[in-house]
Curated annotation (Swiss-Prot):
Organism placement in taxonomy: Bacteria, Pseudomonadati, Thermodesulfobacteriota, Desulfuromonadia, Desulfuromonadales
UniProt record similarity statement: Belongs to the bacterial ribosomal protein bS20 family.
Source species, domain of life: Bacteria
First and last residue of the signal peptide: none
Molecular function GO labels: small ribosomal subunit rRNA binding; structural constituent of ribosome
Entry keyword set: Ribonucleoprotein, Ribosomal protein, RNA-binding, rRNA-binding
Designated gene of the protein: rpsT
GO terms of biological process kind: translation
InterPro entries: Ribosomal_bS20 (IPR002583), Ribosomal_bS20_sf (IPR036510)
Protein name listed in UniProt: Small ribosomal subunit protein bS20
Function: Binds directly to 16S ribosomal RNA.
Protein's UniProt keywords contain rRNA-binding: yes
The organism of origin for this protein: Syntrophotalea carbinolica (strain DSM 2380 / NBRC 103641 / GraBd1)
Keyword Nucleotide-binding carried by entry: no
Length: 87
């Protein structure tokens, strides 16, 4: 347990940031999964729609520092490649 006032504040800030980052990461994973499921079903329109929702969210997560920029770029690249091979 932290004893200093500043350390207590840091603990509170870390908890809030952790909750925010966990939510962003979880939502991002759900959106990526929706793209993969739509692509697996063979429905290109649905896959493109899901991709259009996922890409800005992944970019936003990278901008906020939740994931690395290169990781975001790699995820987007793989999803676009997957959607383009559907149908």
């Amino acid at each position: 347990m932290a004893n200093h006032k500043s350390a207590l504040k840091r603990n509170r800030q870390a908890a809030v940031r952790n909750a925010r980052n966990t939510h962003i990461r979880s939502t991002m994973r759900s959106l990526v999964k929706m793209v993969r499921v739509a692509a697996a079903s063979g429905n290109q329109e649905e896959a493109k729609t899901a991709l259009d929702r996922a890409v800005p969210y992944i970019d936003k997560a990278a901008t906020k520092g939740v994931i690395h920029k290169a990781t975001a770029s790699r995820k987007i690249s793989r999803l676009v490649k997957l959607v383009n091979t559907v149908g």
